[in-house]
Amino acid sequence: MSEDRRIIEKYAALSPYQASTPIKEVLADPLIKDFARFLFPDDWYAPERYTLASVDHLLPFHSHLRLETTLAVIEKVRELRRLKAEVYYPLGKRVGLFYFPSSTANPFSVISAGGGFSYVGSIHESLPHALVLSELGYPTFALQYRSGGARMAVEDLALALATIFEDPARFGLENLHYTLWGGSAGARMAAYLGSYGTESFGQKACPRADAVIMEYTGHTDYSAHDPATFAVVGKQDGIASWRTMARRLERLRALQIPTEFHAYERLGHGFGLGIGTSAEGWIMDAIRFVEKNVGKF
């Protein structure tokens, strides 16, 4: 069993919810109701009949959604609220940071889910990753950003980083090295910030990321100043070609930038953690990559 699967199943087993639980019941949960709508894509209306087994209908660009992962994420934020932790930090009307703290002084991570810039698939593509990373000792943020276009979304990520660096003690951060993670549209966001920094997107200059971790994106832009880059994609991805990702990393390697690339068989777009697929365990490979190339991140 992969370590990420073990963590997800542990939290899923603690959940009071199940497949038949209406999404509206989760939204009304007294522990998390102040921010629960951002657990799910808030750009698309969820019919009242939708249950937690229907979440995949809200994420049309994603695949391999698992009920256990959804339950685990919800239980994690409920646990944090029971401990009186502040889970969601609003940065604007529809912009904010979920924060899963850790007890160690490891560098932190910021994760942006994808959704084609038409919705934010956090329940599948950033919050599960944040849960796993935090359980492994890495403080992790998951970004809620505005949909409607890449520029707007990247500006929201820059705002999030500027907010973190403005007062890191607010989040209990001791180590200010960090990594940027993202899936699909979120990977584009991470790559842009990794290449050009917050100062290129309306914020003061912040320290650059130590590494970028990318899932399945057709992003081709890069710079000579890119950080170490790890990328994963399915070979049957009809949205983001694995060859496009491979070529970008080849260009980074030519600049002596550390890279690692994985293309998985029998797998399409939007697989998230990839539990139950040929990509299962990729997040552990990503952690090892960063630790090898930029130290104990």
Regions found by a protein language model. Give the residues of each.
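N-terminal cap/lid segment of alpha/beta-hydrolase-fold proteins
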Residues: D34, F40-T104, Y196
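Catalytic nucleophile-loop/oxyanion-hole region of alpha/beta-hydrolase
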Residues: G121-I123, A142-G172, G274-A279
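Short beta-strand element of the alpha/beta-hydrolase
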Residues: N106-G115
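Primarily recognizes the serine-hydrolase "nucleophile elbow" in alpha/beta-hydrolase
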Residues: L159-D226
